[in-house]
From Swiss-Prot:
Pfam families: Anoctamin
Topological domain ranges for the Cytoplasmic compartment: 1-207, 262-316, 374-400, 522-553, 612-659
UniProt subcellular location: Cell membrane
Example of a GO MF term: intracellularly calcium-gated chloride channel activity
Entries under InterPro entries matching the protein: Anoctamin, Anoctamin_TM
Keyword ATP-binding: no
Note: The term 'anoctamin' was coined because these channels are anion selective and have eight (OCT) transmembrane segments. There is some dissatisfaction in the field with the Ano nomenclature because it is not certain that all the members of this family are anion channels or have the 8-transmembrane topology.
Family as reported in the entry's similarity comment: Belongs to the anoctamin family.
Major localization listed first in the record, in broad terms: membrane
One GO term describing the cellular component: plasma membrane
Gene name of the record: Ano10
Name assigned to this protein: Anoctamin-10
Tissue: Predominant expression seen in epithelial tissues.
Topological relation to the membrane, as annotated: Multi-pass membrane protein
Amino acid sequence: MRVTLSTLDTCESSFTPLVVIELAQDVKDETKEWLKNRIIAKKKDGGAQLLFRPLLNKYEKETLENQNLYLVGASNVRLLLGAEAVGLVKECTDAAMRAFTYGTRHNFKGFHDNNNDFLTMAECQFIIKHELENLRARDEKMIPGYPQAKLYPGKSLMRRLLTSGIVTQVFPLHDTEALKKLEDTWYTRFALKYQPIDSIRSYFGETIALYFGFLEYFTFALIPMAIIGLPYYLFVWEDYDKYVIFASFNLIWSTVILEVWKRGCANMTYRWGTLVMKRQFEEPRPGFHGVLGINSVTGREEPLYSSYKRQLRIYLVSLPFVCLCLYFSLYVMMIYFDMEDWALSLHEDSGSEWTSLLLYVPSIVYAVVIEIMNRLYRYAAEFLTSWENHRLESAYQNHLVLKVLVFNFLNCFASLFYIAFVLKDMKLLRQSLATLLITSQILNQVVESLLPYWLQRKYCARVKRKVQALKSEVDTTLYEQVLLEKEMGTYLGTFDDYLELFLQFGYVSLFSCVYPLAAAFAVLNNFTEVNSDALKMCRVFKRPFAEPSASIGVWQLAFETMSVISVVTNCALIGMSPQVNAVFPESKTDLVLIVVAVEHALLALKFILAFAIPDKPRHIQQKLARLEFESLEALKQQQMKLVAENLKEEYQEDGKEAT
């Protein structure tokens, strides 16, 4: 019997809840009933054909506090059909990666009719999210019970419910048993070991697994730099000419690790299926607004906004504001140097041990101020980028990343460039770099993980006491879990995590010939970062929906750009050293020309290495080429079959006319 969506039952009273929908407390009953009917309705009737029930039944509502929470799930067959709809790629029995189809399900590795583990829980939740987001308005002109909440044909109902405040949040539930197993193999025992990246991917999805994979790879890639930099730091502190070898190694290292990462990333994402997964058509982001019109691509009615108006907002408002923030950052930097001069003069006047400690205070204060400014600017950048009214989420993210990277780069490194190339004080440069690096690492650990974890523990204790005080006769395990998770913070993505690594990469690579110990501090920080980030994902934030990814995206370009800038800075610093200057006592022009020539040679070597190392391993390239060939052959056969059917129909019609 061929299974189709129209034959599936959506009235199961008991099912495994995967996703929670929270409604506002004052939502009207007719709205709840309408939403329920749309979620459980069959696909042919415009529904999502999912399983849906309130968290509390009538009896439990009398005993427990009603929270307007609803559980969403799906039958195994419905999830498999959904996997085909979203284009999930799975491994076949012949070891090839192909898009999953329900009709050919037995050709896929690990599939059995009675096996519910073929799809990971992250994939199941991603499918449900996709189905909820693809619930479209049909004939309704408004949300029942809310005449002010207008609906337009073809637009996403869930996004409209969220923007109108009827639905307050939609989030996936944790699987407590699977989470406990993951924690045991991931971070509960502090040890120098590889992370369970495949298990992280199965639980949290590809985007988060790629971040932890990159964090692990970057940490181990830093170890050679740390080992080589340690003796340089201990034995040749002032001999800058001897740092030429170390700086040259650093420049080659930064290129090789980024190219090798691309190959490793291709291996991982091919194994996960996201490298060959077809990109879904991108819908307008929830915050996008404009005059109602017809989309020329989809033919659907949706808000339209002139790109000319958007460009005006960017160049007349956003750009001047960013420049103003950059100016303010430079102004704060000059105040920091005034504080340095004050501390130095105080120490020279007294010469005591206490005033020698005071020399580090301006750098520590400045590092804290930098972190505060970075976070305040982030909020301003998000507001401005949202106000620019970008239609697509990808465009929004690209503009946000550009704003944040430019400001963070200047805010974190401007003082170091000023010390290096204006003041030319290498001792102060070492001191400032070390202070900024270590202080920022400590602050990030406390603010991002430890403080939120402590606050979450306090809230968990309050909820548990509240539930235990009810002394209800019903099982409150699921109720307590949902209540705890709904109040957890929302994980906003890997943006801040990659940004932290990007800045760390800058501290390590930009001034490596002055402070070789930076790599060692980065390694120590990253070993604790793995555990604190894992704790953050498992215990501090709500479980995020899985997002398929084939790479680390724009961050690859950001790291490569930083490595190019590091070539210029290290060559300039070596050229400024007294030992190198002594070789050219008469003509500084010759020195400048040689430094520029060496810098160009290193950049040329860098780009040659990047070109010589393929982004994808040979065997992956062959498999991708084979998949493309099979796809073209299948399309060709489908067209030939269609032509044959048309010819057959024409032949039959001609035969009828002849008789």
